[in-house]
Amino acid sequence: MAWHPFNVDHEAHMLVLEARERDRDSLNQAYKMRASCAYGLERFWGEHLRLRGKEPTKADFVKETWKAFCKIMKESRPDLIIPQEVLSNREKEVDIRAEAEKFLRLSTADQQECLTVLVALCDAIVWWTQRLKLKSKPPHADANDIAAASENNPEST
């Protein structure tokens, strides 16, 4: 068995930059994606279906993460068949079920290998999120802001 560079860090970096451009608040999903790895591949894959209706930018972040994961796995294990289709929750149940059943065909060893790579990808996404996330507001009030607020509200002093 030869060593294969998965390029997980590079993929994670690109995913975070794209998500930040799309909607910087969607980066909060990085932590939830990492936590959802504990529930397995199938549930991680299905997370974009759950988010699609109410939080589409977060769903896109999960979807793009899954696509990057599939790309990584295809380059390292072309023989491995994992669901690569990213469906919408409006798809026919037959189509969703057919795609989800691909998980059942994976051996335990293949599932473990895939999950290890997915966890590494999500860990890298969290790492890059912590470094690249844009702040929506400054963490501390400026001294001038505090002085102005106390001038406008004499009861606060």
What positions do the PLM features span?
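Small/polar/charged residue-enriched interaction surfaces, especially the RNA/DNA-contacting tracks
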Residues: 1-157
